[in-house]
A protein has these predicted regions:
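DEDD superfamily 3′-5′ metal-dependent exonuclease/proofreading module
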Residues: 1-247
Length: 247
């Protein structure tokens, strides 16, 4: 069974670790002692945190005794909670906290968010689970999540033709995007952006928007959405354009 430590760091402006919070099972850690923390997490397989891939791990890695699978709750949150008002623990790219500068408290929040993300992923349609895995399984920001839940992608019998990722995306968004969109090119060049766009489109909520941090990190999401949903192909046979853009 995968053992996960949920972590958060407080870092000063010079990159020094000032405080560390950690949770594994019923055990808690709250101290500035990096060596003691490395020992605390040494029996775990995974480290989970909010923005751990781009932030926490670069400060921790020099002190760790081994490599860990990294689970980042930040990058999955827009996929699994696309409806406004998003998740109750989130504000843009930050976890909402009850206390400033309390990494133990934030570690507990990261644990709660991860558990909600796992539940939300398991509640998705199986085809959408497969789509997200196909689009994101090779990206370090997402791969740890799939490993932590031991996700096994569907395998069709060898005598069936394998459905490509772009075909799956087109089918799952049928009637919600222009039928003449160059989905194959988008999937080839913008896999993460396709996943975020698909989540927003299927939310089917006019009030939902792409979170600001996603647009900062993946600015092509907006152009991709416009290409899929705002460019009228003029074909009367296109279910989306004829209904939504010619109305």
């Amino acid at each position: 069974m995968t053992k996960i430590a949920f972590i958060d760091l407080e870092i000063d402006g010079r990159g020094k670790i000032l405080d560390i919070g950690g949770v594994k099972g019923e055990s808690r850690f709250h101290s500035a002692g990096v060596s003691a923390f490395a020992e605390f997490i040494s029996d775990c397989d995974c480290l989970c945190g909010h923005n751990i891939v781009e932030h926490d791990i670069k400060y921790l890695r020099p002190f760790l005794k081994k490599e860990y699978v990294l689970i980042d709750t930040l990058y999955f949150s827009p996929l699994l909670f696309p409806h406004r008002p998003y998740h109750k623990l989130l504000k843009d790219d930050k976890i909402l906290t009850d206390e400033l500068n309390n990494p133990l408290n934030d570690s507990l929040k990261a644990k709660a968010l991860y558990e909600d993300e796992v539940s939300a992923f398991k509640a998705l349609d199986k085809d959408f689970q497969q789509l997200y895995y196909d689009l994101l399984g090779g990206d370090d920001h997402f791969s740890g999540f799939f490993r932590s839940i031991e996700y096994v992608p569907s395998r069709r019998p060898f005598f069936f033709r394998k459905t490509t990722t772009d075909e799956s995306l087109r089918e799952l968004l049928r009637g919600k995007i222009c039928e003449h969109s160059d989905v194959a090119s988008l999937v080839k060049n913008h896999r993460v952006e396709c996943a975020y766009a698909a989540a927003l489109i299927t939310a089917d909520d006019r009030n939902s928007i792409t979170p600001a941090w996603v647009l900062r990190n993946y600015p092509d999401v907006e152009a991709l959405l416009r290409g899929l949903r705002a460019a009228n192909c003029g074909d009367p046979g296109c279910a989306y354009c004829s209904k939504k853009l010619n109305a």
